[in-house]
């Protein structure tokens, strides 16, 4: 069994539900000792990304750097991400169930930009995230409008197009 240099730290951070700047630096130091990220450690970082919402401002760049380096530059063939790796990542990040976070959007964008020949599914996922984000923004705008004008929304005086709701 491959050991994870970061597993115990990740578990503590998930339990605490908060990642501070010092925690990101500790993870960076732990990973710097002993070479590149293992598959288990990549999974540990994804687990932290999925389960903790209160993240240090340093987290996004750390997460994207570590994961992009792992998928694009440490694996063979260099400069590529396979469909299999992309599906593993999408599943582990919960892209199809819980949606994307700013870190996962940034990661997919960087993977797309750094890949020599990005798989079609990567662009499709990025396009899907953009569409979902726009849809959520429209829903927030409609909800805000209805909260400002509750009498119109409750009396049926305001028609909301189905694509907005």
Residues covered by each model-derived region:
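Small-residue-enriched hydrophobic alpha-helices in membranes
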Residues: 1-165
């Amino acid at each position: 069994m491959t050991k994870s240099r970061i597993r115990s730290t990740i578990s503590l951070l998930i339990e605490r539900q908060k990642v501070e700047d010092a925690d990101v630096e500790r993870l960076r130091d732990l990973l710097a000792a002993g070479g590149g990220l293992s598959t288990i450690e990549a999974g540990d970082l994804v687990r932290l990304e999925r389960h903790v919402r209160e993240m240090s401002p340093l987290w996004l760049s750390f997460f994207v750097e570590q994961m992009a380096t792992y998928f694009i530059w440490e694996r063979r063939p260099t400069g590529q991400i396979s469909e299999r790796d992309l599906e593993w990542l999408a599943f582990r990040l919960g892209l199809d169930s819980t949606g994307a976070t700013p870190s996962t959007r940034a990661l997919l964008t960087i993977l797309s930009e750094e890949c020599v020949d990005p798989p079609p599914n990567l662009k499709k996922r990025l396009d899907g995230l953009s569409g979902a984000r726009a849809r959520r923004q429209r829903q927030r705008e409609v909800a805000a409008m209805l909260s400002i004008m509750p009498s119109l929304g409750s009396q049926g005086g305001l028609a909301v197009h189905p694509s907005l709701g």
